[in-house]
Structure formats: structure tokens, C-alpha cells
Amino acid sequence: MSFDRQQVPAWRPGYRFQYEPAQKGHVLLYPEGMIKLNDSAGLIGGLIDGQRSVAAIIDELQQQFPGVPEVADDIEQFMEVARAEHWITLA
């Protein structure tokens, strides 16, 4: 099954992505708690704005990290996990 990169991710209502100094990293806040994101997830999460497609996010991060061939796969995997965990919607 291939991933549709034209989909546009958005954080679900009640979820807030932010940098948390106490955690020294990006977190995803939601009514029941908090998820500390790793550095890669933090970079991807910072580009989820409900306007950019997955393809646009991939393009942006490939420009920032031109020597990392697996960027696109990592972003797709993040999107699949985030959707399965109900952090985001994909439209």
C-alpha cells in the first residue's frame, strides 16, 4: 500500500505541538497527558500546519538535510504512526 503524499496533515482538536524547555524538546500536549517527541518527530511536527501536504513537508526537510536519503520514508512513517495514534488527521 502506498502513502498518498498529497494529503494534508493537521493536529486533531485538543492536541497542541510545542517546544517545552523543561523537557528540552518538542512535545505533543493533549487532555490526558503529554508525549515527548524525538528530534526527528519534532522537526516534522513543526511543519504540520493544516496547509502543507506531506509532499511539501518532505520537500522542505529534504532541502534541510540533502544527504539523508531516508527522509521521505521517515516522514511517511511518522504520519502513519501519528494517524494511528489519532494525533493528526490527513485530508
Curated annotation (Swiss-Prot):
Pathway linked to the protein: Cofactor biosynthesis; pyrroloquinoline quinone biosynthesis
GO molecular function annotations of the record: quinone binding
Recorded coiled-coil stretches: none
Keyword field: PQQ biosynthesis
InterPro entries tied to this protein: PQQD (IPR008792), PqqD_bac (IPR022479), PqqD_sf (IPR041881)
GO terms of biological process kind: pyrroloquinoline quinone biosynthetic process
One Pfam family of this chain: PqqD
Top-level lineage group: Bacteria
Family under the similarity heading: Belongs to the PqqD family.
Summary of the function given for this chain in its UniProt record: Functions as a PqqA binding protein and presents PqqA to PqqE, in the pyrroloquinoline quinone (PQQ) biosynthetic pathway.
Protein name: PqqA binding protein
Species in which this protein is naturally found: Pseudomonas entomophila (strain L48)
Gene symbol of the encoding locus: pqqD
